[in-house]
Amino acid sequence: MTHSSARTTSRLSSYCDGLNRREMLSVGSLGGLGLAELLWMQESFAKAKGKPVRDINCIFLFALGGQPHQDMWDVKPDAPSEIRGDFNPISTKASGIQISDVLPGISTVTDKLAIMRSVTHVDSDHGRGYHVMMTGKRPGAGDFNGNQNNNHHPCLGSMVSRLGTPGELPPYISVPNFLNSGGPSFLGPSYGPFVIEADPAAPDFSVRDITLPTAISTNRNARRQAVLREINRFERQAETVGRSVRSLDTFYQKAAGLMTSKKAKEAFDIHRESDKTRAEYGMTSVGQCCLLSRRLVEAGCRFVAIENGHWDTHRKNTYSLKDLLCPSFDRAVPALLNDLEQRGMLDDTLVVISTEFGRTPQINQLAGRDHWPNVFSIAMAGGGVKGGQVIGASDRRAAGVADRPITPGDMTATVLDLMGIDPHQILHTPLGRPIPLVDDGRPITELT
């Protein structure tokens, strides 16, 4: 198979709302901070609260655009042809569980997966769907394109970054790009993701701020100096209440140490993997992102978000799934789960496969399916999750929930709970307003 770096650079052009990368990256005035600044801010301001955090990391694979549940996870062979589509159910490794024949690879690892077929919410546009599924909370009334500000809820990765224990690597990393609604909101940019901004499937893949630069641009150097001046001002003010804040110079040294650290450099250096292992994942963007994510959690990253795009199949749904989307997805997911298991990491690594909504039961005149948040499917594995089960059910037309509705809040509460973070604890905005991590959801008890 061929390298697919071009896929990620144009990942939004196929979405019906036409979001652009600049809009997504505008998550705060300090959104351009580099690794040293992130390390400084995370260590200076991290205040873990609640019950002790478990040693469980999370790989959060988000299928941007909206996966068609009835063509993948929740096949309806007895529905009319205009609903059931062109795919058929196949038996899987888990007794009694069937999925689509477009996912033969995933059918071999369903014993590790818990498939939730009754996820539901009410937001049918991409921006609002991104937000509710990434944060567990609706963004409020009005149009929303996925570009968070301090009035919105922080995403799961930022919650984990804020409440987890800092390690040698940034606690929240996004690959290959920034995920819609994947920002920290009122928690502040120190808890935002370290974004790779490069496709690990590319032959020349490398990660910024990990390799020592030969030169630093004038603008970037000026920005760092401005941050340092602001830190010095803050240090002087902080002396009246304590000496918990240290010089940013220390964190530049730490970042430089990370650049020269064998462990850190190896974690980001996907080229150290054998050709056989890379081929097992597939030399595609999603395949190599999954492999890189395994390397990152193995090295101590708490939360890795994977952007997997182009699922907005308004046209040619069957062709898009069969020839473009599912082959790479269906290769990457079982490779990741099997690799984690073989390395003894699956019990300590929660893998979440999510999306912003499902697709309409009725196939449209363009042979595609449109947005449908009424019911859809997500899946989880590892991290204490009992595999080989289906939770909830859609109706016979895959149009609504028939049993056990699951909300985005439930999903968010579940991930936090599995990672040992109390989902109902209270955080405060910079103005002192109390905000619960999850105010409308509870952990999905059937998973454990």
How does the language model describe each region?
Residues 1-448:
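Ligand-binding pockets and gating/stacking loops
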